[in-house]
């Protein structure tokens, strides 16, 4: 699904509210047929594993003190779905899925270009194979040639793993590339 609109019309706020990075002020949010607008903390943890986000600016969304490997492994560790020995294997698998060279595993975000940083952000978002991913302007900060690579990666992951995206953008050409449903928003 694509959400398109001018700057300031609330596209990113909608995405952040859906995944509980921001509190809602009105209305309800349903996920898997259940109102998740005001859920208890324990239930929110389970929901958060099923809903992730890929941010517009991969540099500011990645912990500068963590290596590529640590960033991608973090959700695996927090979830307690994997044993310690499995986390390393799963991290390597995810890095390969998103096209991050194994030699970059010990690199820090500032050592990577924008496209590689965004691949790390995507790797972190898909680590637990969530049902729903908000992609908040994930290619707007990238060069045009890199944009196509990242969009193709997102499409490939969507086809292979049945991921559902809410693609937030102001660029119709980007959303046409990735989305079959389109919602527009007008700031006025």
Q: Can you say where each PLM-predicted feature lies in the sequence?
A:
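Conserved small/polar residues in nucleotide/adenosyl-binding loops
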Residues: 9, 183-188
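Helix-to-loop junction immediately C-terminal to a conserved catalytic motif
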Residues: 19
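Conserved ABC transporter NBD signature motif
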Residues: 27-35
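Conserved ABC ATPase "signature" region
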Residues: 35, 85-103
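ABC ATPase NBD coupling module
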Residues: 36-52, 78, 84
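Conserved ABC ATPase signature
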Residues: 108-112, 116
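A short, proline-enriched helix->beta-strand linker immediately N-terminal to the Walker B motif
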Residues: 127-131
């Amino acid at each position: 699904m694509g959400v398109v609109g001018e700057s300031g019309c609330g596209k990113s706020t909608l995405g952040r509210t859906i995944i509980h990075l921001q509190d809602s002020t009105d209305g309800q949010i349903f996920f898997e047929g259940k109102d998740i607008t005001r859920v208890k903390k324990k239930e929110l943890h389970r929901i958060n594993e099923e809903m992730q986000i890929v941010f517009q600016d991969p540099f500011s969304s990645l912990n500068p003190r963590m290596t590529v490997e640590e960033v991608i492994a973090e959700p695996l560790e927090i979830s307690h779905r994997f044993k310690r020995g499995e986390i390393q294997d799963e991290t390597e698998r995810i890095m390969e899925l998103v096209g991050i060279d194994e030699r970059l595993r010990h690199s820090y975000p500032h050592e990577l270009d924008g496209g590689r940083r965004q691949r790390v952000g995507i790797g972190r978002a898909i680590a637990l194979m969530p049902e729903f991913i908000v992609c908040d302007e994930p290619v707007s900060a990238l060069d045009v040639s890199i944009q196509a690579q990242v969009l193709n990666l997102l499409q490939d992951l969507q086809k292979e793993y049945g991921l559902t995206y809410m693609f937030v953008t102001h660029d119709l050409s980007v959303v046409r590339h990735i989305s079959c449903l389109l919602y527009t928003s007008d700031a006025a």
